Swiss-Prot record:
Residues 1-134 form the PX domain. SUPFAM superfamilies: PX domain. This is PX domain-containing protein 1. Transmembrane segments: none annotated. It comes from the Eukaryota. GO terms for molecular function: phosphatidylinositol binding.
Length: 231
């Protein structure tokens, strides 16, 4: 059961002051080329440090489930509260901008909850940087290859660290892409919202250009510096 104060890692006595959703990345999460959408989240902590995280809709669903498990006395309230409504709104969003706004709204709801929840181990662990976040921050997966005798996919490295999420390359979204790819973006990644795994089959072509990127940035997000105590 999660405690009201998180003592599991270096995040003790810290909490998330604000969070914003900057955009979406599509990452390959299996050897078959299945893709999943990850929201890029900018978080500001109580010590003014900033972390950039990547979380999927499935991650948000698991957070909701873990909160209910961690606080069984409040299970019915959490099950019918704003978190559930927020997840449904994200799932039903029909365009990228609406989805980004709904994710941001849900995250702000979470960090605005009573300290019992917002500073619990469950929530702070969700906002802690993961190995996947570190790989995407470096934006160069080849840096970790020399640690292995033979070529290895990021998926294998992530699983060895206890993560089932991974990427072998970064696929990003742009509104100017050909119509053929528009059909690919129509896949709803929220169909299996409350399941641990979900499938997003798609066929990738060689030479995909990862330069395009869908953003949800305001002036505040464009501040040209980052304070990060985790480096």
């Amino acid at each position: 059961m999660a405690s009201a104060v998180f003592e599991g890692t270096s995040l003790v006595n810290m909490f998330v002051r604000g969070c914003w959703v900057n955009g979406i990345r599509r990452l390959i999460v299996s050897r078959r080329g299945d893709e999943e959408e990850f929201f890029e989240i900018r978080t500001e902590w109580s010590d003014r440090s900033v972390l950039y995280l990547h979380r999927s809709l499935a991650d948000l669903g698991r957070l909701w489930q873990r909160l209910r498990d961690a606080f069984p006395e409040d299970r019915s309230e959490l099950a019918q509260g704003p978190l559930r409504q927020g997840l449904v709104a994200i799932k039903e969003a029909h365009d990228i901008e609406t989805r980004l706004n709904e994710v941001e709204k849900l995250l702000k709801t979470i960090i605005s909850m009573p300290c019992k929840y917002s500073r619990s181990e469950v929530v702070l662990t969700f906002f802690e940087r993961s190995p996947l976040d570190q790989v995407l921050k470096n934006d160069n997966v080849h840096k970790i290859q020399p640690s292995f005798q033979s070529p290895v996919k990021i998926s294998e490295i992530m699983r060895s660290n206890g993560f089932c999420l991974a990427n072998t390359e970064t696929i990003v979204i742009d509104h100017s892409i050909p119509n053929g790819r528009d059909q690919q973006l129509g896949v709803d990644p929220t169909e299996h919202l409350f399941e641990n795994g979900s499938e997003f089959p798609s066929e990738l072509e060689d030479g995909d250009d990862p330069a395009a990127y869908v953003t949800n940035l305001s002036y505040y997000h464009l501040v040209p510096f980052e304070t990060d105590i985790w480096d």
